[in-house]
Curated annotation (Swiss-Prot):
Signal peptide: 1-24
Name of the protein this chain belongs to: Flagellar P-ring protein
Subunit architecture: The basal body constitutes a major portion of the flagellar organelle and consists of four rings (L,P,S, and M) mounted on a central rod.
Function per UniProt: Assembles around the rod to form the L-ring and probably protects the motor/basal body from shearing forces during rotation.
A GO-annotated cellular component: outer membrane-bounded periplasmic space
InterPro entries for this protein: Flag_FlgI
HAMAP family, per database record: FlgI
GO molecular function: structural molecule activity
UniProt key word Isomerase: no
Disulfide bonds: none
PANTHER family on file: FLAGELLAR P-RING PERIPLASMIC PROTEIN FLGI, FLAGELLAR P-RING PROTEIN
Domain of life: Bacteria
Length: 335
């Protein structure tokens, strides 16, 4: 008898452990390390080689071409430069964290003048600057536009590996005395669980939560000058993140996304020929009746209403009414 009891207890422990591990997420997927971030770059450039789809006669474009040719050693004084084969563009790119000089990055090119298409154009050498106005990359190359060029959006395109990083993004992460994690979705429960799990993994009280979204980690002596290894260890730790009970509905598309913790109290709703009862209730003479137990989830309610053929629009209206009545326990976000 004892063996059977022990077996059942062990089976239950393993079952719930599997459930927890199925919901677990790595810290690297729910948090970011302060200082490890991408940087946006932007620049103004000129596209040439267009087949009559450029800006044409434009004072702004004319001055840009004269200035560009002047840098190439061609002096053009009082020249009104007009061509339908060139276009003024804005070039944008995202520089990855720890990007190094010589590494290529993709760029986006968008027309800002009267050009009708950038198809077949070539971007001339364009410096890309960060928010501090320092040049971090230089772009150049042939523009690629998706699709067949007829029905696609031809005033914007991409150049894969079209820019080369010219300056390193410097940051020393190997010898820091403290690191800071920022939760992508701040939550006190998730922060507390993260601290407990990190301290258990590191074998001491090294992590502490400053608020619902900030966790500070003191570098253990065993990881001194080994910050990369420490962060790799922390990133791989699995946490069961908590989340608010929330229902998100999109009225335009009829899409409904429901969190697993959203519950509904006892409530009765009449919507046209439809009657919805959550809690004590029996089917009456209504044309369409849905009777559910008190404390059911929104998912169970939606499933029951779907069986009755309720349209997405009516579903959203019913959920909004339940929320207004105070019977829906969670946030209702309408997009």
């Amino acid at each position: 008898m004892n063996k059977i009891t022990n077996f059942l207890i062990l089976s239950a422990v393993l079952f719930f452990s599997l459930i927890e591990s199925a919901n677990a997420a790595r810290l690297k997927d729910i948090a970011s390390i302060r200082g490890v971030r991408e940087n946006q770059l932007i620049g103004y450039g000129i596209v040439v080689g267009l087949k009559g789809t450029g800006d044409g006669k434009n004072e702004f474009m004319s001055k840009s071409m004269v200035r560009m040719l002047d840098k190439l050693g061609m002096k053009l004084d009082n020249v009104d430069f007009a061509s339908k084969n060139v276009a003024a563009v804005i070039v944008t790119a995202t520089m990855p964290a720890f990007g190094k000089a010589g590494n290529p990055i993709d760029i986006n090119v968008s027309a800002i003048g009267e050009a009708s298409s950038l198809q077949g154009g070539t971007l001339l050498q364009t410096p890309l600057r960060a928010a501090n106005e320092q040049v971090f990359a230089v772009a150049q190359g042939s523009i690629v536009i998706g699709g067949d060029g007829k029905d696609s959006h031809t005033t914007a395109g991409r150049i894969p590996n079209g820019a080369t990083i010219e300056r390193d993004m410097t940051a020393d992460f190997s010898s820091r005395k403290m690191y800071r994690l920022t939760l992508i979705n701040p939550d006190f429960t998730t922060a507390a669980r993260s601290v407990l799990t990190i301290n258990k993994e590191l074998g001491g009280h090294y992590a502490s939560a400053k608020d619902s979204g900030t966790i500070d980690i003191i570098t253990p002596f065993a990881y001194e000058n080994r910050g990369v290894e420490l962060l790799a260890t922390i990133e791989s730790i699995e946490i069961n993140p908590d989340m608010k009970a929330r229902v998100v509905v999109n009225e335009k598309t009829g899409t409904i996304v429901i969190g697993d913790k959203v519950k509904i109290s006892r409530v009765a709703i009449s919507h046209g020929a439809l009657s919805v009862k959550v809690g004590d209730g029996k089917k009456g003479a209504e044309e369409k009746v849905a009777v559910l137990d008190s404390g059911v989830s929104v998912g169970e309610l939606v499933q029951a209403l779907n069986k009755l053929g309720v349209s997405p629009k009516d579903l959203i209206t019913i959920l909004q009414s339940i929320k207004s009545a105070g019977a829906l326990h969670g946030e209702l976000e309408v997009l």
